[in-house]
Amino acid sequence: MQYRDLRDFISGLEQRSELKRIQVPVSPVLEMTEVCDRTLRAKGPALLFENPTGYDIPVLGNLFGTPERVALGMGAEAVSELREIGKLLAFLKEPEPPKGLKDAWSKLPIFRKIISMAPKVVKDAVCQEVVIEGDDVDLGMLPVQTCWPGDVGPLITWGLTVTKGPNKDRQNLGIYRQQVIGRNKVIMRWLSHRGGALDYREWCEKHPGQPFPVSVALGADPATILGAVTPVPDSLSEYAFAGLLRGNRTELVKCRGNDLQVPATAEIILEGVIHPGEMADEGPYGDHTGYYNEVDSFPVFTVERITHRIKPIYHSTYTGRPPDEPAILGVALNEVFVPILQKQFPEITDFYLPPEGCSYRMAVVTMKKQYPGHAKRVMLGVWSFLRQFMYTKFVIVTDDDINARDWNDVIWAITTRMDPKRDTVMIDNTPIDYLDFASPVSGLGSKMGLDATHKWPGETTREWGRVIVKDEAVTRRIDAIWNQLGID
């Protein structure tokens, strides 16, 4: 099923008993985090806080708190269907030339569908039903959460930041947390390699000293939100991909104060600029690692205009030690990653990002090994093929007889098929998540690869052990008489 906007998604979830309206007053300061955290851990519903303490705007939380709701948001009825989305992205990332006329005709509908999903620009949009400008702008109207006791202040978490570099044809969508530091000021915490930061850097080089236009959409439709966190090929815009997920074109509207285009059905839009050189210390905040991050300096976004729907809904989340909402997103998107990796490395049989590993810091890969050194090639490929795995610190590679999603299996493979010195790959001075305080230098650290595969001649001089396998005939015989044995 496809959802036109966030309200349509809320209605659909409610019909499935996947959303609960909370009428009891709950504060966005710490209390909503506690309620959402308990609900997520219980695999409970999305929550619509209709009476946030001190505010008139409802807060939507725990929206993507189960993999099933992530799948629904991407237009799928089951998590398993996300593999098909991954296959489409794999095809778009590395399209193969047609093998003949028949093959060309078979692929034509895919390209036609992609072309037909180009965003549609509209003149009038519900996200601009109410316009607040100038001195009337006050972010204090929004029920922005303060999530943890040690947080320095309220934090916008689910904003889709829209930017456009001076040398690019299309806009970039990114989700960056934003610390509220005044009635019209937030700190834009984007890392140097992210799209928004790259657009800003190019702008400063081409237009030194000039304000950089930025817009932030809050409460977009689920396909657009999830499109911003999916590994979309550079040749495809997030808006077009959202159209593919939704089954109809993404409607955009030009902002009132700049040329950026934002989702027309979003709940709230923040428009403004970043003045080059205006920086502020951000944090500390509790984050997805389960720790408070260190304070660092980032650009300040000045909000010049707020537009919103009549009676808007504020979409929010929290991040903390897994499981949290980003970890659940990671579990679902894991299914999208598998076909993309298999397109490049057909020998891969499964790929798993354990959510307890902060969603991306550890990966387990199973493969059909074909030659000595093959496992090392695959682990190096994981680190380099998709930028989403740039910060993956540990890659474990095992044979395809191991269940990548079963720690009992994985640990058995590590302890029986590895020699620590021979089968461990260490790489120094690689990009590491800025939030990873365990690295010796901020943003720079090491990576470890573990080859837990059977070793081939050339990798070992010893005879390799044979796995114990039960006799199938005996197993069937005991199955047949098991109840007669009287063993509970």
From Swiss-Prot:
Associated pathway: Cofactor biosynthesis; ubiquinone biosynthesis
One of the GO BP terms on file: ubiquinone biosynthetic process
Q: What Gene Ontology molecular function terms does this protein carry?
A: 3-octaprenyl-4-hydroxybenzoate carboxy-lyase activity; metal ion binding
- One Pfam family name is UbiD
Q: Which reaction does it catalyse?
A: a 4-hydroxy-3-(all-trans-polyprenyl)benzoate + H(+) = a 2-(all-trans-polyprenyl)phenol + CO2
Query: Which Enzyme Commission numbers does its entry carry?
Result: 4.1.1.98
Gene Ontology CC: one annotated term: cytosol
Q: Which UniProt keywords are listed?
A: Cell membrane, Decarboxylase, Flavoprotein, FMN, Lyase, Manganese, Membrane, Metal-binding, Ubiquinone biosynthesis
Domain of life per record: Bacteria
Q: What class of enzyme is it?
A: lyase
How this chain sits in the membrane, per its record, is:
Peripheral membrane protein
Catalytic residue positions: D287
* Entries under HAMAP family matching the protein: UbiD (MF_01636)
Q: Which family does it belong to?
A: Belongs to the UbiD family.
Function comment = Catalyzes the decarboxylation of 3-octaprenyl-4-hydroxy benzoate to 2-octaprenylphenol, an intermediate step in ubiquinone biosynthesis.
Q: How does it assemble?
A: Homohexamer.
This protein is called 3-octaprenyl-4-hydroxybenzoate carboxy-lyase
Q: Which gene encodes it?
A: ubiD
